[in-house]
């Protein structure tokens, strides 16, 4: 489905071995100033039609972000003995090599492999049939695969199909792989690819059409709103193919064609069988491949799976309900946290519903701090609220960020929610112009969806949404994400739904979180029930797509399954949470800080929680307007990151001007600042890699030397 994939940055961390005792106690500890991991919520569905963007998920930059919070101890509790060792899931090692004995580097060289840009991977461009299903059609298309050869004794090939549809595998290959246990990259040639039509495999885009589509506002609960919704979907279905530049590709971008490209790649590499991992939409791809070429799979991993037997209407109805439920669970988790509840000033669910009702009635005017230092008059709408809410319920970290922004709104500050909305809608916060992400394609996203699913005419789609509108109180508009398919060109045939996946002779590991809004838990359970050799791993709470986030239970089960042929019990439960530990908002007035050390530590935390920084790529310089005036600029440095502050204030009365740095090697940070406001001063702030802080200098006419 066109799932609003998080594809989510993950912090790769070494994980302890999963224990084989009957029960492993599930405990966690997490304290500190900031957050444990940087996640990237996707461009999500919060309006009737929002970007379904698949962003990089495993973290490159800002190691200090995770260092500010003590690492949580993520344990695993199996329903019965956690791991059992069975005979090898794969043929003997030599069977995975091509018959000529040719090594991987030699194979890649034979296929014209070259280094992928700014990557450790080797890129191979294959020319494949445009229409695999019609041998008489001689047209071709190029598809790019990226391979990281095994670092040790080769076991075989491990292929990842990323989420979307529309997400680039090449764009995330290095960051995903950094989160793997080293034993995976030692044993496997790791493979990612750009699906036909997107990124390096075609570059098809429709950025302007998508921006217009996602920026439209209407209420599907009213007749007039339904009319506008349908008109906008029709307009997008016309404008997107026209903008993409090669609309003739549209009939050939579906999953049924795309899996044939992978099969061509397998044949060219010469492996008889390989290991396939799919996440979110990638599970749609992986199951389609497994249904046709199951004999070519040594094992299959489905993370955040889609039940392909459901119709589009059935799937989206279940998904819309899940989005609303995860939002409610997020708000309930806030109510159980003293600091979050205090910041919210009352019941968090009521805070959200009250704001939503107010914005439904009338957009709210507010001033947004620009990177230039000026304030811009802006309007915050109900659609903006839903965009941010839907986008930011994908992971524990993003849910906590949304709660902080919602709490700020209860004290009259809408700019934090606006930052989240702009990030969710891929808008430049200063100009509100659409941002181009080369790792994502709306054109391919809808082309795949509209090839894979049949919805019939728009009226049928809208009437199918009536039950959702009546039963889902929050974020039900997610249901309408595929409405453009009712108008999509080259549509008009019903692909039908596939038979349930059998995967005879293929062990299947299925992963899911109980707080997954995009691919709700029932999908995974139904898939597992139909498979004879399948194993379900359920993380309590957790994100959408659970492998690679640093949860030792989940990651070790996957690593053992891949590297050591270890199969878990039929169902295993792993510890997890709905939200990361809540970090309180700073006081609005600097007079409420105990001392300048507390003020500077708070400022460092606030920088970390800016969405522009939270999802920074670590390479592109950027600037933001600070909450109470001034600006902050961030850029990479030879040893880490460099900051420039100019009158920047996150609390009234504590304006900071100067420079700062974060050093990747030591994991320490430093700020050298002149401060103004309540008291003038010249301060130097240091935080070491262990989290100890110190400030020295002069403040309010007095020398200070404070440490904690």
Description of each model-found segment:
Residues 93-384, 447-449, 453-708:
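Gly/Pro-rich cap/lid or specificity-loop segments adjacent to the active site
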Residues 368-387, 394-398, 433-443:
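Structural motif
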Residues 64-75:
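Bacterial N-terminal signal peptides
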Residues 415-453, 458:
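Long, low-complexity segments enriched in small/aliphatic residues
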Residues 55-63:
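Bacterial N-terminal signal peptides that target proteins for export
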Residues 23, 29, 52, 76-100:
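Ser/Thr-rich, Proline-interspersed low-complexity disordered segments
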């Amino acid at each position: 489905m066109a799932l609003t994939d998080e594809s989510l940055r993950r912090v790769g961390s070494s994980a302890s071995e999963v224990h084989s005792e009957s029960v492993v106690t599930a405990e966690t500890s997490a304290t500190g100033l900031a957050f444990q991991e940087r996640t990237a919520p996707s461009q999500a569905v919060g309006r009737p039609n929002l970007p379904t963007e698949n962003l990089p998920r495993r973290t490159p930059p800002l190691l200090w972000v995770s260092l500010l919070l003590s690492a949580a101890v993520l344990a695993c509790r199996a329903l019965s003995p956690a791991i059992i060792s069975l005979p090898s899931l794969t043929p003997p090692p030599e069977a995975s090599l091509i018959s000529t004995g040719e090594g991987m580097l030699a194979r890649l060289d034979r296929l014209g492999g070259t280094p992928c840009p700014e990557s450790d991977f080797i890129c191979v461009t294959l020319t494949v049939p445009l229409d695999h299903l019609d041998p008489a059609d001689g047209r071709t298309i190029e598809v790019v695969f990226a391979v990281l050869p095994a670092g040790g004794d080769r076991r075989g090939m491990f292929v990842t199909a990323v989420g979307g549809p529309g997400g680039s595998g090449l764009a995330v290959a290095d960051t995903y792989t950094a989160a793997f246990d080293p034993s995976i990259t030692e044993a496997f040639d790791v493979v990612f690819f750009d699906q036909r039509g997107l990124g390096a495999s075609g570059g098809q885009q429709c950025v302007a059409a998508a921006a217009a589509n996602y920026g439209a506002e209407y209420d599907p609960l009213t007749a007039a709103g339904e009319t506008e919704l349908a008109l906008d979907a029709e307009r997008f279905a016309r404008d997107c193919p026209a903008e993409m530049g090669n609309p003739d590709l549209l009939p050939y971008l579906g999953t049924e064609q795309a899996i044939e490209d992978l099969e061509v790649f397998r044949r060219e590499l010469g492996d008889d069988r390989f290991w396939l991992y799919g996440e979110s939409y990638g599970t749609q791809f992986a199951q389609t491949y497994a249904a046709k070429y199951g004999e070519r799979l040594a094992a299959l991993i489905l993370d955040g799976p889609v039940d392909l037997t459901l119709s589009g209407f059935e799937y989206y109805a279940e998904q819309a309900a899940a989005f609303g439920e995860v939002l409610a669970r997020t708000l309930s988790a806030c109510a159980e946290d003293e600091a979050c509840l205090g910041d919210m000033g009352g019941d968090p669910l009521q805070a959200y519903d009250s704001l939503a009702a107010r914005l439904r009635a009338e957009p709210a005017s507010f001033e947004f701090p620009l990177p230039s230092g000026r304030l811009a008059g802006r309007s915050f709408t109900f659609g903006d609220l839903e965009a941010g809410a839907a986008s930011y319920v994908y992971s524990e970290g993003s849910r906590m960020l949304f709660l902080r922004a919602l709490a700020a709104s209860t004290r009259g500050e809408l700019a934090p929610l606006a930052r989240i909305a702009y990030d969710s809608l891929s808008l430049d916060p200063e100009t509100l112009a659409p941002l181009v992400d080369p790792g994502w394609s709306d054109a391919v996203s809808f082309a795949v969806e509209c090839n894979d699913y049949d919805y019939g005419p728009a009226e049928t789609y809208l009437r199918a949404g009536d039950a959702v509108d009546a039963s889902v109180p929050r974020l039900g508009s997610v249901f309408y994400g595929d409405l453009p398919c009712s108008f999509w060109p080259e549509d008009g045939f019903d692909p039908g739904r596939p038979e349930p996946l059998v995967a005879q002779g293929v062990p299947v590991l299925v992963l899911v979180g109980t707080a997954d809004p995009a691919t709700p838990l029932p999908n995974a359970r139904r898939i597992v029930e139909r498979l004879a050799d399948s194993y379900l791993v359920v993380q309590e709470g957790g994100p959408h797509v659970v492998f690679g986030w640093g949860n030792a239970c989940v990651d070790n089960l996957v690593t053992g399954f891949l590297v050591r042929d270890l199969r878990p019990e039929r169902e295993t439960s792993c510890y997890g949470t709905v939200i990361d530990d809540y970090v309180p908002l700073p006081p609005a007035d600097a007079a409420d800080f105990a001392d300048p050390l507390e003020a500077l530590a708070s400022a460092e935390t606030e920088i970390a929680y800016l969405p522009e920084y939270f999802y920074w790529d670590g390479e592109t310089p950027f600037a933001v307007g600070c909450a109470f005036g001034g600006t902050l600029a961030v850029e990479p440095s030879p040893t880490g990151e460099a900051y420039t502050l100019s009158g920047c204030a996150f609390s009234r009365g504590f304006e900071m001007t100067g420079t700062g740095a974060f050093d990747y090697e030591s994991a320490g940070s430093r700020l050298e600042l002149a401060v103004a406001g309540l008291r003038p001063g010249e301060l130097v702030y240091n935080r070491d890699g262990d989290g100890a802080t110190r400030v020295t200098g002069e403040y309010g006419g007095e020398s200070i030397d404070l440490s904690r």
